[in-house]
Regions:
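Conserved short secondary-structure transition element at the edge of the structured enzyme core
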Residues: 101-102, 138-174
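Flexible C-terminal active-site loop/helix
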Residues: 164-198
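Active-site beta->alpha loop and helix N-cap motifs at the rims of alpha/beta catalytic domains
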Residues: 1-49, 57, 198-199
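Structural signal for hydrophobic packing residues in well-ordered secondary-structure cores
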Residues: 34, 124-128, 143, 159-166, ...
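Soluble or luminal CAZymes and related metallo-dependent hydrolases
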Residues: 22, 134, 176
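Glycine-centered loop/turn motif at secondary-structure junctions
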Residues: 2-4, 64, 86, 104, ...
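Conserved positions within tetratricopeptide repeat
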Residues: 133-136, 156, 185
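Catalytic alpha/beta core domains of metabolic enzymes, predominantly
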Residues: 31-37, 44-149
Length: 201
């Protein structure tokens, strides 16, 4: 609270086995400590070992309608089916953006939006304005290219050619080896997706 933050993206604890009851209690404790918080749930089973059920999300929203305001869905079991008024559903991949918008999702939250934000925004704006989709294929191709490698390592390696600060990573994160880095850049170049194109956008 000393930093004056109210909005949070919070994943359930990792490394422990638990169910919906314990997850609800976990978020309840946070909200009791910070009643003015606004929380986006982070649904990412591969990282924490727990996958939100629709029932659990609905129970949390029912219990805390002002505090539980959305979910980042990186397990992709919610975004096609979860419908709650005044609640944002945000898939965790650019490849799910257009389909998610068609289903009523609010947008996306993704790591690769650090480089794909311009394309993602165009897909979003064209959907809202009912224009022809001209950027979605490239957006998905860029995302799929990064996914062929360790995604976070790939992002840092790609961006480090423009700013060496991106080489500064803490274990267990590491940069791609030189062979994989060059392969990533070559595949992105084939899509006409370069650091130069990002700066121009």
């Amino acid at each position: 609270s000393s930093l004056d933050f109210n909005d949070f993206l919070i994943m359930p604890p990792a490394y422990y086995k638990y169910g919906d009851k314990e997850v609800i209690e976990f978020y309840s404790r946070i909200i009791e400590a910070r009643p003015d918080s606004r929380i986006i749930l982070y649904n990412f089973e591969k990282l924490c070992g727990y996958k939100f059920s629709i029932e659990c999300v609905k129970e949390l929203v029912k219990k805390f309608p002002k505090q539980i305001v959305g979910v980042k869905d990186s397990s992709y079991n919610l975004y096609e089916h979860l419908k709650i008024d005044n609640f944002s559903v945000l898939p965790g991949s650019e490849s799910k953006l257009l389909k998610g918008l068609e289903l009523g999702c609010a947008g996306i939250i993704t790591a690769t939006c650090n480089v794909s934000a311009g394309l993602s925004r165009k897909v979003y704006d064209d959907f809202i304005e009912k224009k022809e989709q001209t950027a979605n294929e490239m957006l998905c191709n860029v995302r799929n290219t990064f996914e062929k490698f360790n995604l976070i390592s790939g992002l840092h390696s790609f961006l480090s050619d423009g700013d060496k600060i991106y080489k500064n990573v803490l274990p267990p994160i590491s940069l791609l080896n030189e062979k994989d880095k060059q392969k990533l850049i070559e595949e992105l170049n084939k899509l006409n997706f370069t650091l130069g194109s990002l700066k121009a956008a």
